[in-house]
């Protein structure tokens, strides 16, 4: 279950989890730290709010939603990413998060982050689909043993009717969505 504070879906997911008979250990819950919650203390506070809203004791995966950028944070973007990551590492070491990662980080963002990271990101959730394979970012992540998780893996709806994708899917006995 992919959530994020900025999506506004944590409360609804939390209510659904509470009302269901699903055992917590049988589901994988991801959430993301939003851009305004940067720095060590803000990250820890945002995480506490997220698990309270979801009604869970831990997250399976917690991601920094976007890299801090110079335009938004002036010259403090790398410092804020590092402080934020340090809080994520501490939450991971405390057992409150099973895996930590980033979202929308490109190789140059990861290079900067890993200069201060004790624990490297375990996941980089990026937009990847047949129409935008992001080969450089995928290769970088693979070379650094960082799992790539695709957001928008189907890309545009037209991917489902793309002739090349349909041919590949048929060849492998799959649907176009499964190939994407």
Residue ranges and their predicted role:
Residues 1, 59, 100:
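Glycine-centered flexible beta-alpha turn that most often forms the glycine-rich phosphate-binding loop
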Residues 33-41, 71-77:
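Active-site mouth loops of central-metabolism enzymes
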